[in-house]
Amino acid sequence: MEAILRAVDAPYLEKAVYPPKLVGMKDGSKIVVRQASRAEAPEVLKAVRLYVDVNKDFYDIVAWRTYAEILAWKMYRIKDHYLLLGIQDDKLVGIVNARMWDQNIAISLHTMSFKRGIDVGPALYFAKMEHAFDHLGAREWWATFESYIGLRIMGTEWAPKQKPFPEMQHELGGSRIFYTTKEDWENFVKLKYARYLGEKPVPKDLLAKSQKFRIPEKADV
């Protein structure tokens, strides 16, 4: 039965691992952005659980949905999913996830910042778009937004277009699809937000430190 139920990742996803980088934050610090492994899912889930009862800025619904997605990934019940981490020193300060619908379309899932006010969310959102377009070969990025903050920043300032609604609906609850093409990425997003491209390679000591991250002690809201 497991062979029937298991969501097996496409070979191209396994070959294209996100290259770690350092990205500067508003407070002058730098975070390591790297791809998570399934073995790290239980620890990431502990961080997400801190927000499931936070009734502010839609953290609760985002946390519950993100928890379900990462748990599904851990248990091989979501296909072609990837999870990126933002780590400041040795502390987990944010996560983003997405999945490939096919080799042409990437589906944005969720963005969670565990440290507010330093630009973690947009930096990580940029990183998951970067992975889809530059490493996995996507032609379009399909996003939707549950929070006003996400809609205001990535859904407005980053100038995505919209698919016809309700004729076309995002897999997250049948909501509106905000999409960015490969051309939009190269000619606008990547240029305007080039600061999020960061520095590569990550120094070995910082990368090693990021491998054993600590989760936040409490929700930062």
Kindly give the residue locations of the regions a language model identified.
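Acidic, small-residue rich beta-repeat scaffolds with periodic aromatic anchors
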Residues: 161-164, 180, 188-203
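Conserved catalytic-core motifs of GNAT/GCN5-like acyltransferases
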Residues: 144-145, 160-181
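Glycine-rich short-loop/terminal segments
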Residues: 44-45
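A conserved beta-strand-loop-helix scaffold within acyl/acetyltransferase catalytic domains
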Residues: 35-38, 48-106, 111-113
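Short, high-confidence coil segments that cap the C-terminus of an alpha-helix
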Residues: 81, 136-138
